[in-house]
């Protein structure tokens, strides 16, 4: 994602100061979401917990999911409101995810599926270590995966799409 600001041939190269945003603290985010959903949902705190668990407090994905949940609640859809919102977002981005997936090489796909299944590709002994390391670095640099205490798919909706469509 940062490529568009760091690649010399990009029209956005050094467009402005690049700022990396940290995750918003859980309790602050929960309080904010609970307040906003309080007018349309009886169990706003529970829904906020579910949203934050799914997005891991990532600001963009939390905002996206919260908005979809809110829209569903306002439309009178109360049953499985979180899953419905997740499915709506995945359906909206289905072609984008498919196009993205088709541009990955075989190793990158293997790594992405492995991460989705909760495995650590760096410790995978079915593939050469150098191959796994190269793939992890490449996917990290492109912003598809992040590493905290373990590797994770950055976009929780893409992770869910992979689990739904690519794992048999």
Regions found by a protein language model. Give the residues of each.
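Short, amphipathic alpha-helical interaction segments positioned at domain boundaries
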Residues: 158-168
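Short, well-structured alpha-helical segments
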Residues: 45-52, 63-66, 112, 133
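Short loop-to-helix capping motifs
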Residues: 57-58, 155
């Amino acid at each position: 994602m940062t490529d568009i600001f760091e690649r010399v041939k990009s029209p956005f190269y050094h467009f402005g100061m690049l700022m990396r945003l940290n995750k918003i603290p859980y309790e602050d985010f929960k309080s904010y979401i609970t307040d906003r959903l309080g007018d349309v949902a009886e169990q706003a705190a529970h829904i906020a917990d579910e949203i934050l668990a799914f997005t891991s407090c990532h600001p963009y994905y939390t905002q996206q999911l919260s908005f979809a949940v809110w829209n569903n609640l306002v439309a009178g859809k109360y049953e499985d409101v979180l899953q419905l919102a997740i499915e709506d977002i995945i359906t909206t981005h289905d072609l984008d995810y498919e196009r993205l997936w088709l541009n990955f090489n075989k190793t990158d796909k293997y790594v992405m599926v492995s991460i989705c299944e909760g495995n650590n590709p760096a410790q995978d002994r079915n593939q050469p270590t150098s191959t796994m390391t190269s793939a992890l670095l490449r996917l990290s640099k492109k912003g598809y995966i992040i590493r905290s205490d373990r590797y994770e798919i950055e976009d929780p909706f893409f992770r869910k799409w992979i689990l739904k469509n690519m794992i048999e």
